[in-house]
Structure formats: structure tokens, C-alpha cells
Amino acid sequence: HFVDDNLMANREYAKDLFRHMAGLGVRWGTQTSIEIARDEELLDLAWKAGCRIVMVGMESTSQGNLEAVRKGWGRADRYRGAIRTIQGHGIAVHALIILGLPEDTAGSIDGTVDFLVEAGAAAAEFFLFTPYPGTPVGDEYRREGRIVDFDPTHYREPFVVFRHSQLSAAELQ
């Protein structure tokens, strides 16, 4: 048993590891970036090494949301093709999505679900956005008076500690 939250960040290291794991008969999954879809050799080696699922932190299917939380390096417009590429190598994609980002609306959340179904994601998991104190977004929300709950024990799901511009706390929960 081993754990690595960023197993494929160093692609050359991961490829070497996967070559050594091939043939062991171990089935496994990992967290990784959607960017692995750009490396066909890595995907082939991961599958041969037993990788059958990747949990991918897409966060949002809205480019504006990605930029708002400083993850603009992600490209929402490439997600559909990336999901298909990864799954075309026999590796299921488990999408990790954050709800309650700045541009989210009830319609955009429904659109995210529709997108994931149409793109063929094997699974999806949804998390509530939390603007933690001390982070740039958390500090920004505090300055704007959008933090409505300062209880540190509520900075986890299912609590909504901020006022969203378009969704109520009940809608987010």
C-alpha cells in the first residue's frame, strides 16, 4: 500500500514506476491532473501497471470560475476530449467538482452535470466551495463582507460560510 496525492506530477518518474509495476496484477487508482490526457505513453503505461481510475480535480467546467479561484491554467474547453482520451486507455475518470464558485448559477450547475454525463465521466463527486481564512479568496470575501459564519468548525461541508452572489446557502447545500 502506498499513497501519493500527485503520483503523475513528475511524468518521467511515474513512467519508470509504472514500467516496474506492470505485470504485478495490482489494480489501483490515483488523484491526478487532467493534463495527463496529453501524454499517451503515460496513459498506456499507467493502464499496464494496473491503473483503472483517476480522480481528476476539474473544479469547474467554467473557465471564468477556474480563473476566479486562480486555477486558470486548467482549460475547461479541453475537458471533454481529455475525459475521452483517458477513458479510451481503459482508465475511468472520476471528476471532482466544486460547487459555489463565483460564476455558478443553478443553471450552470445543472449544465456541469449534463456536461459530465455527455462527456462520459465514469463518476463525479461534488464539494462545496469554502473561502478559507488566510487564503487570497477567503481574505477577499472577508473584505467584501461576504463571510457570514466565522465559526471555525463550520469551515467544512455541509456548511456554507459565505454569501454567494447568485445562489442561496440552501441551494448550495
Q: What are these language model-derived features?
A:
Residues 6-12, 16-173:
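A structural motif corresponding to the C-terminal lobe/cap of the Radical SAM core domain
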